[in-house]
Each structure stands twice: as structure tokens, then as C-alpha cells.
């Protein structure tokens, strides 16, 4: 292997979330603005990003671990506003960086009359004020590329919301008057060339990011009245009628055999690829089940766009911003269509995964049941074999087979049949007290008989042992007689 190959193999590689089918539309990812409440008039602020603002504010305030080191001082912190609706985590991180460093961002530049580009914001003493941070967020949302995204802004107090409203009234009114001078702008709050698009959702949520203030019912329209943290799982949209409900209805029609086609081109739709078609995502349009190819819908939105929103042929817009639904004729953001497509795809994949897991679980249970059944059958067969063996053994015992106690002359228990013995030596009653023991060879070669005498009743037990078991078969004799004790 060459050195170049080794370098290539050892090189750390990363996968983009935007390539190879890895991209997802996150349910929720927000950039947020914090303000320190350590003092009454504190101007310290902090900008960050997170998929879970209620948890993140607790981390910053030390209630949970993994808070930012720079916010460990000047606690407590209060969340002023969040910007969310980003189509990817990467887009949110780009917005966060530009919000933190507006004097370096290429997105926050404007062209003067001399065709020179100038930064709207400079690094001065007011760069961390709440007013400046709100103005930077407003400028980012009003300029490309973020003005093409389906973003939403949520405020958690009247003060920050009022700053936004005052900036909105000033934006687009003042024009940049510049010659060849490169003098820095004095007041960047007045240097915005255009205002935020009306389609951007502006929400005042007095319940706070954690929903514990008890003031949520005083909010503007568009905020849920019940208490609790903000919805970071996007359940209301993803599980609502506009996404899940309409797809279930379309699925029923597909299973019933209906031939569903694109509303615009009348061509067939590949319903197994959820990123190639769209269903009207408006929950308020209960009767609209308009299905279109995404490409057809994009062309339709571009063709139907107002004249003032169109660009010259030399600078065409690749993607539309919003348009009218071909069926219900209501305004829908392009980003809302894409968001619904990814939500639908995720739900279908989760359902398929759960179905596969359920089938695998059933198969595993069936396999275990089959093994248990086989084991039970084997156990029953074994019991039958043991029962037959017990019956055979009982029959042998009833025919004269007995079990003899262990002999004092033999190291192993002895089983003998009268007249046919496999033992080398057996004492008929070894528990009897012995007075005298005599042995002699009787009955032929290799057979030795011994007597055991009891003085109390004069009973003599006679045993025999075989010296060579392989050459002669032992013979057993029991004699009982009353006689005088041997002297």
C-alpha cells in the first residue's frame, strides 16, 4: 500500500446532512437571543441555536448541565426572542454565525450609489445591546438568502417586540446616500434597504419559552392558549389534518384503486417517493386534496408570481417563495410544501419501521413457541420411555429380583437372584452380632463358604464368595437351623 493511500484512509471524513439522502427537515431548530438579568439595566446579550429552547435556557441558568461557559456568569438569563423554521440545521448555524458577527457576514452588506459594498453593522460599543441584536435579526430575515426561507419569529416580552415593530416602520424608508467615501454608517438601524416580507410569521408569546408565566392568554393570534413549553416536536403541524390527515385520505383512495394524477400536468405520480409530490398542506382547506409534482408546482408558482416579485431573465429565481394553491386558490409558502413533504416521508418511514418490528416480534414469538412445543413433545416422549423402563423393572422384581444391602465384604451394593448371583461376596444379615466366623472351601473349586453365628437365637448365616467370577458362577445357599453354639 502506498503512502498516499494510507493518508487517504487515515483522513477524517464527514458526511454532509444535505447529500446522499441524509437531509431532513428538522421538526424544530431555532436561533435565540438571551439577555442577562443580573442587573436591572444590563445590556449583556448572548446569541445561540438549539433544537430545544426550553431545555437550553435551563442549561444557561445552571439548572441543567452542559450550559455555555460564557453564560456561567451574569446569571440569570432570559430568552427574548427566537427565529425558527429553518429547512436544515446548517441553515440555522449560518444564521446564528451571521447574527453573532454581523460586521463580518457577507449577507449583511449593501451596495451604495458608487456600486461599492458596505457592511451595515460595525463592531462598536453597542454591538451587544438588545436593540442592535434585534436589528441584526431583522436585517438577516429581510435579505437574501434568508428571506427565501419559511421563517417565523417569536417574542417573549413586549419590550423586544416593540423594538422589532419600530425597526419595521423605519426599514425601507431611508436610502443609502454614499459617494466614494468609505465612512462607516453612524446609525445602522436606519440603513436597511427593505423590510421583512409579510409572509414571515411574527408572534408575541407572553407565556415565555417555558410557558410558566401564566400570561399566554394575552398573546397575539396564532399562539396556543394552554400553558406549557413551546412545541419543539412540531406536533401540531405534522400530526394535524394538513399533513397526516390528508395523506391518510389520499392513501385510502390509492388502496381503493383510484387513479390519482398531478393536478397540473395530469401525469401519474410515484406515491412511494414522498419528495417528488406535494399535497396541499393547508389544514383550513378541509376539502382540498390537490396533488402535484413538486417541479410542476414550482413552475406554477413562478409563472403566477406578481410582476414586482419577478427577476430579469438574466437573474432568474431558482425556487419560488410562495404562491396560490392550484385548487383552493389560497396562498401557501413553498417552504411549507417542502416541510410537509419531509414530515409525511418521516411518518411513513416510521410506520413501516414499526410494522417491520411488529412482524419480526411476531416471528420471534412464533419461533419460540415452536421450540417450546418441540421441547414439550421431547419431554413427553422421554417420560413415556422412563415409564416403560419402570414397568419393566417392576416386572423383573416381581419375578424374583431383589436388592441386597451393601456387604461388608464388598465395596459396592449387591443385587442377587436366588441361585444366580453376580456378586463376589454377600452377607445375608450383616447387622447380626458375630461370635465366631469360620470359613472353608465347599461346593467345589473356587467357592468359599463362611458361617456367621448368633448366640441369642442360634441362627447361622452362611455366605459364599467366588474367587474367580469369570471361571465359575457363584452359588448361594441359606441355611437356618437351631443348634448349640460351636465351641
From Swiss-Prot:
Main location: nucleus
Tree of life domain: Eukaryota
Compositional bias of kind Acidic residues: 465-475
Disulfide topology: none
GO-annotated biological processes: double-strand break repair via homologous recombination
Annotated ranges, domain GIY-YIG: 27-109
Zn finger (SLX1-type) location: 262-328
UniProt subcellular location: Nucleus
Keyword vocabulary terms for this entry: DNA damage, DNA recombination, DNA repair, Endonuclease, Hydrolase, Metal-binding, Nuclease, Nucleus, Zinc, Zinc-finger
Cofactor(s), names only, from the UniProt record: a divalent metal cation
Gene3D superfamilies: GIY-YIG endonuclease, Zinc/RING finger domain, C3HC4 (zinc finger)
InterPro entries: GIY-YIG_endonuc, GIY-YIG_endonuc_sf, Slx1, SLX1_C, SLX1_endonuclease, Znf_RING/FYVE/PHD
Keyword Lipid metabolism found: no
Basic and acidic residues bias: start-end ranges: 359-396, 438-455
EC number: 3.1.-.-
Task of the protein: Catalytic subunit of the SLX1-SLX4 structure-specific endonuclease that resolves DNA secondary structures generated during DNA repair and recombination. Has endonuclease activity towards branched DNA substrates, introducing single-strand cuts in duplex DNA close to junctions with ss-DNA.
Sequence similarity: Belongs to the SLX1 family.
PANTHER family documented for this protein: STRUCTURE-SPECIFIC ENDONUCLEASE SUBUNIT SLX1
Protein name: Structure-specific endonuclease subunit SLX1
Organism: Cryptococcus neoformans var. neoformans serotype D (strain JEC21 / ATCC MYA-565)
Amino acid at each position: 500500500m502506498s503512502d498516499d493511500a494510507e493518508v487517504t484512509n487515515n483522513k477524517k471524513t464527514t458526511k454532509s446532512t444535505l447529500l446522499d439522502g441524509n437531509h431532513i427537515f428538522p421538526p424544530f431548530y431555532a436561533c435565540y437571543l438571551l439577555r442577562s438579568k443580573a442587573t436591572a439595566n444590563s445590556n449583556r446579550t448572548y446569541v445561540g441555536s438549539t433544537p430545544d429552547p426550553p431545555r437550553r435556557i435551563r442549561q444557561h441558568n445552571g439548572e441543567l448541565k452542559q450550559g455555555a461557559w460564557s453564560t456561567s456568569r451574569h446569571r440569570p438569563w432570559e430568552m427574548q426572542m427566537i427565529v425558527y423554521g429553518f429547512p436544515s440545521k446548517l441553515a440555522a448555524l449560518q444564521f446564528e454565525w451571521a447574527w453573532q458577527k454581523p460586521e463580518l457576514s457577507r449577507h449583511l452588506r449593501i451596495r451604495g450609489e458608487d456600486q461599492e459594498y458596505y457592511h451595515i453593522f460595525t463592531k462598536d460599543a453597542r454591538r451587544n445591546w438588545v436593540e442592535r441584536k434585534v436589528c441584526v435579526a431583522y436585517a438577516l430575515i429581510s435579505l437574501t438568502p434568508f428571506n427565501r426561507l419559511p421563517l417565523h419569529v417569536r417574542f417573549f416580552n413586549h419590550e423586544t417586540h416593540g423594538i422589532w415593530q419600530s425597526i419595521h416602520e423605519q426599514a425601507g424608508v431611508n436610502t443609502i446616500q454614499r459617494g466614494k467615501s468609505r465612512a462607516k454608517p453612524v446609525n445602522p438601524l436606519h440603513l436597511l434597504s427593505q423590510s421583512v416580507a409579510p409572509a414571515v410569521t411574527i408572534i408575541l408569546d407572553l407565556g415565555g419559552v417555558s410557558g410558566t408565566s401564566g400570561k399566554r392568554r394575552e398573546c397575539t393570534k396564532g399562539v396556543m392558549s394552554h400553558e406549557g413549553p413551546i412545541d419543539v416536536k412540531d406536533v401540531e403541524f405534522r400530526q394535524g389534518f394538513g399533513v397526516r390527515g390528508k395523506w391518510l385520505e389520499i392513501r385510502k383512495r390509492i388502496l381503493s384503486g383510484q387513479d390519482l394524477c398531478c393536478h397540473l400536468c395530469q401525469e401519474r405520480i410515484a406515491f412511494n417517493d414522498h419528495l417528488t409530490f406535494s399535497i396541499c398542506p393547508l389544514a383550513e382547506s378541509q376539502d382540498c386534496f390537490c396533488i402535484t409534482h413538486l417541479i410542476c408546482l414550482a413552475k406554477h408558482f413562478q409563472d403566477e408570481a406578481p410582476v414586482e416579485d419577478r427577476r430579469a431573465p438574466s437573474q432568474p429565481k431558482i425556487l419560488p417563495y410562495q404562491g396560490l394553491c392550484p385548487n383552493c386558490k389560497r396562498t401557501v409558502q413553498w417552504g411549507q410544501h417542502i416541510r410537509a413533504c419531509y414530515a409525511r416521508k418521516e411518518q411513513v418511514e416510521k410506520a413501516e419501521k414499526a410494522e417491520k418490528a411488529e412482524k419480526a416480534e411476531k416471528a420471534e414469538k412464533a419461533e419460540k413457541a415452536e421450540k417450546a412445543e418441540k421441547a414439550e413433545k421431547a419431554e413427553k416422549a422421554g417420560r413415556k420411555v422412563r415409564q416403560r423402563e419402570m414397568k419393566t423393572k417392576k416386572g423383573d422384581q416381581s419375578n424374583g429380583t431383589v436388592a441386597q444391602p451393601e456387604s461388608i465384604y464388598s465395596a459396592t451394593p449387591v443385587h442377587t437372584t436366588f441361585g444366580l448371583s453376580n456378586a463376589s461376596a454377600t452377607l445375608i444379615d450383616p447387622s447380626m452380632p458375630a461370635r465366631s466366623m469360620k470359613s472353608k472351601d465347599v461346593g467345589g473349586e473356587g467357592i468359599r463358604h463362611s458361617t456367621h453365628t448368633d448366640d441369642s437365637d442360634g441362627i447361622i448365616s452362611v455366605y459364599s464368595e467366588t474367587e474367580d467370577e469369570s471361571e465359575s458362577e457363584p452359588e448361594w445357599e441359606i441355611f437356618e437351623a437351631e443348634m448349640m453354639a460351636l465351641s
